[in-house]
Amino acid sequence: MNPINLLLLCGGGGDEHAISLLSANYFETSLAKLPHLNVLRVELDAKGQYQSKSGERCELTNRREIRFEDESLAPWPVDYVIPCIHGYPGETGDIQSYFELINLPYFGCDAEGSRNCFNKITAKMWFSALGIPNTPYLFLNQLDEQAIAQTTDALAKWGSVFVKAASQGSSVGCYRVDDAAQIPAILADAFHYSPYVVVEKTIQARELEVAVYQYRGETVATLPGEVICAGGTFYTYDEKYAADSKATTKVVAEVSDEIAQQIRAYAVKVFDGMKLRHLSRIDFFLTPEGEILLNEINTFPGLTPISMFPKMLANHGDDFSQYLNEAILTGLNR
């Protein structure tokens, strides 16, 4: 087999830049087990500047090659790219659109699937259209007195709500509201992160996650794992990634077989129904009454030391390096 030049593009310059670098470390370790790959790690910053791991300034060109600022270095042709970028521009569909424009094969969900999942409003419309239960919500498209009134009414009806920036990941721009006096300031904060905002009913429930991925010709959904937050708190960005986080996880949640199989069925249905590709982490709520509600889809899940996706894949009996190898070779028709 001829060597494959694989670009591991990471960072992105968004709110989740640092987490993307941690996930890239996991990819780098996994790819190192595949000797037919030549891997070049390049970091993309908030200004759109590229820099290789060894410090050379460079850029990805429309000719599908890395060109270096130091012209004594030969251009590096790119056969395949893994865009290890959480949040913007990696999970928003932006960078996938560019790859599609220059006909560069890449790993992960396509541009449309990424956009549809990243925007919480669009995603919930898809969930409902596919007949998958999800949390009651309303959406707002501007910060004004009407938006404040609608949110106040929702709080009165539901007792507690979450205000979420519609186009953010990892709980960025997401706030719990229990007091109407909080609403104006919290809406202002949420609209700072996104031009659209979702207001959801607070669900007192267990938080379950499923790793979904395409492997050996089928869509695989693992047994659900569980995130357990200290004192019933919300799994915030800080709780996910802080060194002193009190949140704990279980790779396999303690639920009945019936619940587990229904969650897996919903996960496969939404993955296939939204025409997602390669991998996603799909998050659910399980209420004390046994109601299952789809919460959200992460089209490029974290692969940090504390992340659930790689642990659930391994627990299912699959090897991440071999899974990657199949996806790469299939994408290159080899």
Swiss-Prot record:
Main location: cytoplasm
One Pfam family matching this protein: Dala_Dala_lig_C
Listed EC numbers: 6.3.2.4
Binding locations of Mg(2+) 2: E296, N298
GO CC terms of this entry: cytosol
Keyword Glycosyltransferase carried by entry: no
Binding site for ATP: 154-209
Example GO molecular function: metal ion binding
Catalysed transformations (reactions): 2 D-alanine + ATP = D-alanyl-D-alanine + ADP + phosphate + H(+)
Protein's GO biological process: cell wall organization; peptidoglycan biosynthetic process; regulation of cell shape
Keywords in alphabetical order: ATP-binding, Cell shape, Cell wall biogenesis/degradation, Cytoplasm, Ligase, Magnesium, Manganese, Metal-binding, Nucleotide-binding, Peptidoglycan synthesis
UniProt pathway: Cell wall biogenesis; peptidoglycan biosynthesis
Coiled-coil parts of chain: none
Binding-site residues for Mg(2+) 1, renumbered to this chain: D283, E296
PANTHER family associated with the record: D-ALANINE--D-ALANINE LIGASE, D-ALANINE--D-ALANINE LIGASE A
Sequence similarity: Belongs to the D-alanine--D-alanine ligase family.
Function: Cell wall formation.
Name this protein carries in UniProt: D-alanine--D-alanine ligase
Gene: ddl
